[in-house]
Amino acid sequence: MDISCEIEECKTREQQNSKRSAKACWGTVFSDLGALMSIALPMLMYFTFTKNDFDTSPLLKVVMLLFPCSYSAAGYFLLCYSSRTAHHKTGILYHLLNVLLVTFAAISILSIIVLPIEKWSKRLLGVYSMPSSSFVVSLTYLLYTSCDLTTASFTDTGITAFVELLSLLFLMSYPIFLTRNPEYYPYLSIISAILILARSFKEKYFPNKKTSESVVRWRLLIFFVILGFTTFSYIMAGLSCLHIIKEKCENFAGNQQILNK
């Protein structure tokens, strides 16, 4: 009887381990390959099509925004799902985190719908295809990979935290680069992709080890800094979308008044 129970337990553990391995594999494909593709494809579209192509075909605008914004929305929904299946669900902070993640995903989806209706200048086309895309993807990647919300655990050797801080500082410097010549825009996407590759390479060939309690607190601080910066960035993105909607509604109302006269 005991032997049969042990066999059943072994089978159960093997099934759970295989599920974890599959989940980890798909998580890696999404977080790494998905991020790199979401940065590269909009940049490729920018150099493949002309501004006139985007003006005459709004669908191209949608496709360009679809890659980074879909990656962003999917990443935050996955984080929300991980948070809901977490072992530790503590009160207000748990619910606030879920609300924030769903809000980030909703703003990402709203951006796909709203931004294409705006008239894009040559400079704005460059911004949406490179700095904006790499910014959104890198920010999502940082938050997605900085913590396992299912177990509320951090695994780090110190190098990963350094790469995360470097990526965060680079993202914070984006407004400075946006004021520069658009010729610099491709470098923002390339550097963002390199930082993602560096973190992925480190995780694959030098996997993290469990850290002490003190380092966990330090990593928790990094996570909240990333979350705070992400919140600020998506508030600005949401306000920008609302401003575009407001302008379009005012223009529509003005045109209706002219027609009625």
UniProtKB/Swiss-Prot annotation:
Q: Which domain of life is it from?
A: Eukaryota
Which Pfam family, giving just one, matches this sequence?
A: DUF2463
Q: Write out the similarity annotation.
A: Belongs to the UPF0328 family.
The name this protein goes by in its record: UPF0328 protein ECU03_1620
| Species of origin | Encephalitozoon cuniculi (strain GB-M1)
